[in-house]
Amino acid sequence: MPVLGSQRRLLGSLNCTPPATLPLTLAPNRTGPQCLEVSIPDGLFLSLGLVSLVENVLVVAAIAKNRNLHSPMYYFICCLAMSDLLVSVSNVLETAVMLLLEAGVLATRAAVVQQLDNVIDVLICSSMVSSLCFLGAIAVDRYISIFYALRYHSVVTLPRAWRIIAAIWVASILTSVLSITYYNHTVVLLCLVGFFIAMLALMAVLYVHMLARACQHARGIARLQKRQRPIHQGFGLKGAATLTILLGVFFLCWGPFFLHLSLIVLCPQHPTCGCIFKNFNLFLALIICNAIVDPLIYAFRSQELRKTLQEVLQCSW
């Protein structure tokens, strides 16, 4: 696996290899004495990966076990868990191999290690793309269920959901292979950043519109019950808090990584940008944290899923 300065995490090639279409080079030692670098120990990476691995395996197992959860919405949540599971597996695998190599327990040729690193890079990149796609799919599914409630079951059918899921996985794998193969082209980085911005905008527009509709519905109920002010304010605050958490977690966990990719194109030699480049490991750790938080936001809030999860933990299959 490529060792580039202090950064030895997945997608390291995107971190320090400049785009070939522009004469860009990253200057590793021009960040100045006040540059803050957050060191992420391998043990922490391994711990985060294992926690995420256990969480998302439980989500997949619970949805697979309970037939009441075999619906398009839960299939999207299950696929999101599988995407996060790939992030966890890739992280655990890479960290374990790195620790074994550093300890001298595992001895292999550099070419083999490089091939393993390429495979892991494809896994992590495809999991990132698919995770973003399924987050968007969940938002669209919820939007349709609110604004087209009467037509929901005719619009979001199981065959259609399966086709969407298959298309997302195929597109994610192709995108990851192309991204890793042509990582040194500016257009690849810009496409990845543009994809993130598009998904962020899609989720923000849909969830804000859903919140506005929910508040409007709450006001209507309040007027009928002649208790407009207390109900509306309480519901609006709760909805705004939920929306802030949902979009805030998404932006905080994914934003720094895609900011990093943007700066590789915009200012690869600027000292300030160099400070940001030095924290690449931190940005990847935040993505793993997102894989831990996703089940808490999208899966474990379901009472039916929590009940099934208890049965899974008790091994009562």
From Swiss-Prot:
Membrane topology: Multi-pass membrane protein
GO CC terms in record: plasma membrane
Gene Ontology molecular-function annotations: melanocyte-stimulating hormone receptor activity; ubiquitin protein ligase binding
Subcellular localization(s) per the UniProt record: Cell membrane
Chain ranges on the Extracellular side, renumbered to this chain: 1-37, 94-118, 184-191, 267-279
All ranges on the Cytoplasmic side of the membrane: 64-72, 141-163, 212-240, 301-317
Domain of life of the source: Eukaryota
S-palmitoyl cysteine lipid modification positions: 315
Keywords assigned by UniProt, alphabetized: Cell membrane, G-protein coupled receptor, Glycoprotein, Lipoprotein, Membrane, Palmitate, Receptor, Transducer, Transmembrane, Transmembrane helix
Pfam families: 7tm_1
Glycosylation sites: 29
PROSITE patterns reported in the protein's UniProt record: G_PROTEIN_RECEP_F1_1, G_PROTEIN_RECEP_F1_2
Transmembrane portions of the chain: 38-63, 73-93, 119-140, 164-183, 192-211, 241-266, 280-300
InterPro entries: GPCR_Rhodpsn, GPCR_Rhodpsn_7TM, Melcrt_ACTH_rcpt, MSH_rcpt
Subunit structure: Interacts with MGRN1, but does not undergo MGRN1-mediated ubiquitination; this interaction competes with GNAS-binding and thus inhibits agonist-induced cAMP production. Interacts with OPN3; the interaction results in a decrease in MC1R-mediated cAMP signaling and ultimately a decrease in melanin production in melanocytes.
Family label: Belongs to the G-protein coupled receptor 1 family.
UniProt xrefs under PANTHER family: G-PROTEIN COUPLED RECEPTOR
Protein name listed in UniProt: Melanocyte-stimulating hormone receptor
Lineage summary: Eukaryota, Metazoa, Chordata, Craniata, Vertebrata
